[in-house]
Regions:
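Auxiliary, metal-adjacent structural segments of Zn-dependent hydrolase domains
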Residues: 1-42, 53
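Stable alpha-helical elements in mature extracytoplasmic
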Residues: 2, 6, 60, 64, ...
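Structural recognition of the beta-strand scaffold that forms the well-ordered cores
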Residues: 22, 46-49, 71-73, 147-153
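Short pre-active-site segment immediately N-terminal to the catalytic Zn-binding motif
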Residues: 48-65
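Catalytic Zn2+-binding segment of zinc metalloproteases
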Residues: 67-87
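Pan-zinc metallopeptidase signature
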Residues: 129-193
Length: 193
């Protein structure tokens, strides 16, 4: 039933990059789901879901979309694993976002002005409080990867924002990509939105 629940949320073919579905538990109210690459190139992925935390439908939906966004933005078409760090592109340990990727474009659009502030004070919640109006959730302020995952989740789940707050600009960012708009349309149809 968990696989069916996940499959029911996402557009047809969205899970083609996944080779493994894992059911695990770390107890109630802990990690609901995660994704992880299965190889050193980000080509094949694992999706893991905890049935102990999967009962609340809204939280389950938000979490699956969030975790799927990590796959969407960090798979081998979007990121280069093992490439040398580049000052021109967004980097995480062991990964460089490809030029023109969703994550690199998002980083350049929204994070270059934050970087020194974020690195100077690793207290995520303090950083969030200084920039609260710029993030859709406090967790989004963790780093660009979490920000894009949270932003894409609510791009899918919410109606298009009409304001000009930075968090709204982040949700509207995804309208630049016809394939992401199509993903949104199909996912919303599956969710009855």
């Amino acid at each position: 039933p968990l696989w069916a629940q996940v499959n029911a949320l996402l557009p047809e073919g969205a899970l083609d990059g996944f080779s493994r579905f894992t059911v695990f538990t770390d107890g109630l109210d802990e990690t609901l789901a995660y994704v992880s690459p299965l190889d050193d190139t980000g080509t094949r992925w694992e999706l893991a879901v905890d049935p102990a935390d999967a009962g609340e439908l809204d939280w389950f939906t938000e979490t699956v979309l969030h975790e799927y966004t990590h796959y969407l933005t960090l798979n081998d078409t979007q990121a280069d694993y093992g490439a040398p760090e580049s000052g021109a592109r967004y980097c995480e340990e062991g990964m460089v976002a490809r030029s023109g990727s969703y994550l690199d474009d998002f980083y350049h659009a929204f994070w270059t002005d934050y970087l020194h502030d974020r690195l100077a004070n690793p207290d995520s919640y303090g950083f969030y409080l200084r920039h609260q109006a710029d993030f859709v959730t406090d967790y989004a302020s963790t780093d660009p990867s979490e920000d894009i995952a949270e932003s894409f989740t609510y791009f899918v789940l919410w109606d298009a924002p009409e304001g000009d707050a930075v968090w709204e600009e982040k949700l509207n960012f995804f309208y630049r990509y016809p394939e992401l708009v199509e993903f949104r349309t199909q996912a919303r149809a599956r969710l009855g939105l």
